[in-house]
Every structure is written in C-alpha cells, then in structure tokens.
C-alpha cells in the first residue's frame, strides 16, 4: 500500500460525519428543525417545514464530550422530544447553522409523513471484533422495506473499515449506509454514543429508514493539502500501522511533524495519512485514533493494509 505522509495539512475543521442529503418525493412531507443547547437554554432554527418537538420521529444529537458526560443530559433531550428515537454522539466540534461550536449540543429533529424509522444498538464489548458487532447491529434492523441505514459508532474502540464491511454484508448493495465515528475533541481518550439512553463508550447505534416514499443521496468533501513523499507500508495489522518502508512508522511520523510532535496525540488531528489502497477506486484519508509509545505503533479509524 502506498501512502503520502499527509500530511495533508488542514484547511478546514475535520469532522467525523459526512454530509447527508435526504430527498423526499412530493407525496412524503419531511419536516426538519435544528436545535442548539448551550448553558441550559434551547435555540431553534427551522431547516425546512417545522418539525414539532412532540411529533419528531428521530433526533440526532451531536455534542462536546463534557456536555454529554453530564448526568441527566439524555433526560434533558427526551423532555424536549418525548416521542422520538434519540441518538447521541460526541464530536470534535458541532455545526450549528454556518458556525462551528464547541462544548455544546446540536440536535436535528426529523419528522416524516410516510417514512418509518427503526433503531438498534450494540456494545463493542459484547462482540469479538468490529465486524461481528456490525453483523449483530444490522441483524437487529428489520430487512423488509429497508432503504437506508445511518450509523454512529464509538470512535476509539471500533475499526471503521470492519464496521462498514459487516453492515454492507447484511444490508446488501441496494441499501445505502452512511454515518461516522464519534469524536473526542483533541483528547484521544474515549468517545460517547447512545441510543435512547445516557451516552457511553463502546456503543454503536443505527437508524433504519423504510419505504419507497424517500430517496437518499450522500456526499463528502475533504479540505486537505497533501505533502510529503509517497512511501510504502511494510508492516501493519488491520488498522494498526507499525512500519513504513521498513522504518518505525511512529518515529517517521514524528520526524515529519517536527515541533508538532511534542503536541501528540492532539496534533495528529491535523496530520492524517493519505492512503492508496490496492484495488480501491481512489485514495482515502485515514485519521489517527491513538499512538502507542511502547509498541511504537499508530492506530487509525480504518484499515491500513
């Protein structure tokens, strides 16, 4: 596998969740509202037709870890949306309207006229690996009429590549799957995810959208500038990188970072790797989840085979 030590320099803030576009036919009304919770106060911004708090089917919550750790934060959200399925996911920055927020909570409330939604969750601790956890998670969603699966996962304990493989195997090629891994700001310690409960580490949640009255498309865009020479990975295991061209990967990474190496692991957010996977249509950016000084290894959000 060929990589650029990206040392892709960061142009934009790096978020874990790709943009998603829910397109509905004219006979299926979709109502969407955006909420911001900060300092014990709620603010509302209507995205399309107003989604009523009491009738919202699904509420997607993204927040700073400090906010999601507060006892009773789930109860605060549930009080606002009593009938909704509620997902919660920690971030490295929350987007509200056109601005990036930190240490707050942003909630997206969705309400459909004809589309039904089912949800499911698993704990990675109950499964041998991320692939098995994905199989179990997808198996909890009814298959009949399934159109789309939105997934949010622990970002420290889960291998994103294996998660996607398992989900796609169960759902099949005709069902779109998008989502992302939870963030932890610049701390690299633990992430929080929850479904209809106080969020906790190790959780993976999914929301399935059903019926022919909805069409889903998706897109993503990166903002990285690539620099550094192309090099070949010579030793790795799944999403753990050990050697690049027979050199210790962590030491080589630190060499490229220069003074920024002193700020690891936080500075790793600014310098992911640009990876060319054999047989893949195009290269991917791999975000670093952690570094291990004893093993001299680096763990990424997805495979670096």
Language-model features and meaning:
Residues 28-80, 84-85, 89-305:
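Small-residue-enriched flexible segments
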Residues 17-19, 186:
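Residue-level recognition of conserved structural "scaffold" positions that shape functional pockets
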Residues 15-16, 141:
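Hydrophobic alpha-helical elements and their junctions with loops/disorder across both membrane
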Residues 8-9, 25:
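Acidic, Ala/Val/Gly-enriched low-complexity intrinsically disordered segments
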């Amino acid at each position: 596998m060929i990589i650029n030590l990206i040392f892709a320099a960061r142009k934009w803030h790096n978020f874990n969740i790709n943009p998603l576009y829910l397109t509905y036919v004219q006979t299926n009304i979709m109502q969407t509202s955006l909420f911001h919770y900060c300092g014990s106060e709620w603010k509302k911004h209507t995205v399309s037709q107003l989604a009523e708090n009491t009738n919202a089917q699904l509420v997607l919550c993204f927040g700073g870890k400090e906010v999601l750790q507060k006892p009773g934060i789930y109860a605060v959200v549930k009080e606002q949306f009593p009938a909704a399925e509620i997902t919660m996911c920690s971030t490295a920055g929350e987007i509200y309207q056109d601005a990036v927020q930190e240490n707050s909570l942003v909630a997206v409330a969705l309400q459909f006229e004809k589309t039904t939604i089912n949800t499911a969750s698993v704990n990675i601790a109950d499964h041998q690996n991320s692939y098995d956890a994905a199989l179990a998670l997808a198996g909890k969603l009814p298959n009949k009429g399934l159109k789309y699966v939105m997934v949010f996962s622990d970002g420290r304990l889960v291998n994103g590549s294996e998660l996607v493989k398992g989900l796609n195997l169960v759902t099949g090629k005709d069902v779109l799957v998008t989502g992302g891994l939870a963030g932890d700001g610049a701390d690299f310690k633990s992430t929080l995810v929850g479904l209809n409960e106080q969020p906790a580490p190790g959780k993976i949640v999914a929301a399935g959208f059903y019926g022919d009255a909805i069409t889903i498309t998706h897109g993503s865009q990166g903002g990285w500038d690539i620099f550094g020479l192309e090099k070949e990975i010579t030793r790795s295991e799944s999403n753990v990188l050990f050697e690049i061209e027979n050199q210790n990967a962590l030491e080589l990474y630190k060499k490229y970072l220069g003074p920024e190496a002193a700020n690891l692991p936080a500075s790793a957010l600014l310098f992911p790797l640009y990876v060319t996977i054999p047989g893949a249509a195009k290269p991917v950016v791999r975000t670093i989840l952690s570094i291990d000084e004893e093993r001299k290894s680096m763990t990424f959000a997805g495979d670096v085979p």
